[in-house]
Amino acid sequence: MTSADHVESAIAERREIVNEAVSEQLPVQKPERLYSASRYLLDAGGKRLRPTILLLAAESLADVEPLSADYRQFPSLPGDEVDVLSAAVSIEVIQSFTLIHDDIMDDDDLRRGVPAVHREYDLETAILAGDTLYSKAFEYMLDTGAPAERSVEALDELATTCTEICEGQALDVDFENRSDVTTEEYLEMVEFKTAVLYAAAASIPAILLGSDDETVEALHGYGLDIGRAFQIQDDLLDLTAPSDELGKQRGSDLVENKRTVITLHARDQGIDVEGLVSDDPSDAEIEAAVQTLEDAGSIDFAREMALDLVTSGKERLDVLPENEARQLLEDIADFLVERSY
């Protein structure tokens, strides 16, 4: 089995566990329309990558064989038991909350191959569903059974993460009306909008299980690094992957004039990025635009940045015991920049 296959298997195994926990902790109850809308995207699919990272970090910290311990009664370092699965559900429902509100702001029609929540239901219900998931996430983080001090610290991390996600989204909106965005500003936006939830997923188990500050900070840094690499790989795939694999038009970021590490680098090389493609480009036009970006070194620049971030993230895992769960966390970092979807 290749490392990619190993990662896919680890994610699939934990995805099933997390999906069952979501059904258990977020039942469709009265008012049914609200809770049906809240569950809608969670039931539509998703890799469950962030909760997988949380559960693997817990397994590595506790130095137990993967899937050998009950996630609902997980051994902490001081010797008490913590429900790390509830924390994993908390992280996943935050992810779903952000997707619902993102789709509203972008007026998108589809998400995960199904109509967006505001299309399937209505705008008011979608807003309420997102708000419900946001508040439920804090309930689930409190349900871990960790001692008060560790619970409060985990809640503080979750609250800070949610604030930063909103700040990142605000920066993204602001960038749409600016032509002078720098690469540094873009990476800050990516850190807040995308990477901080990976950082929370990696560091919260260390908080709940009673790890020292050095370990918490190292795992937080791991999450930030791989989260930024994840977004850069998404930017690369938009240009390099076929449309049928992407589930959207290849080069859509160019058509929509979105700021990415690639286009910002190209702009700095003197390329008229906004003029690379028309509003309804042909495949040949997209291919020519990608070649222009290749020739400018912009695609290689982004690839190298993503790989450097992954290397940095993996080095931060030195705080963990050498075990299979840690190796899987390293393999996930590689997977994020090697994936083709």
From Swiss-Prot:
| Annotated GO CC locations | cytoplasm
- Name the cofactor(s) required for activity, per the record: Mg(2+)
Instruction: Report the subcellular localization.
Output: Cytoplasm
EC annotation? 2.5.1.81
**Binding of Mg(2+) 2: at which residues?**
102, 106
- For this entry, list what GO says about its biological process: isoprenoid biosynthetic process
Q: Supply the enzyme class, top level.
A: transferase
Cited PROSITE patterns: POLYPRENYL_SYNTHASE_1, POLYPRENYL_SYNTHASE_2
Q: Which UniProt keywords apply?
A: Cytoplasm, Lipid biosynthesis, Lipid metabolism, Magnesium, Metal-binding, Transferase
Its biological purpose: Probably involved in biosynthesis of the precursor for C25 (sesterterpanyl chain) moiety of C20-C25 diether (2-O-sesterterpanyl-3-O-phytanyl-sn-glycer) membrane lipid. Catalyzes the condensation of isopentenyl pyrophosphate with the allylic pyrophosphates to yield geranylfarnesyl diphosphate (GFPP). Geranylgeranyl diphosphate (GGPP) is the preferred substrate, but dimethylallyl diphosphate (DMAPP) and farnesyl diphosphate (FPP) can also be used as allylic substrate.
Family as reported in the entry's similarity comment: Belongs to the FPP/GGPP synthase family.
Q: What is this protein called?
A: Geranylfarnesyl diphosphate synthase
Q: Which organism is it from?
A: Natronomonas pharaonis (strain ATCC 35678 / DSM 2160 / CIP 103997 / JCM 8858 / NBRC 14720 / NCIMB 2260 / Gabara)
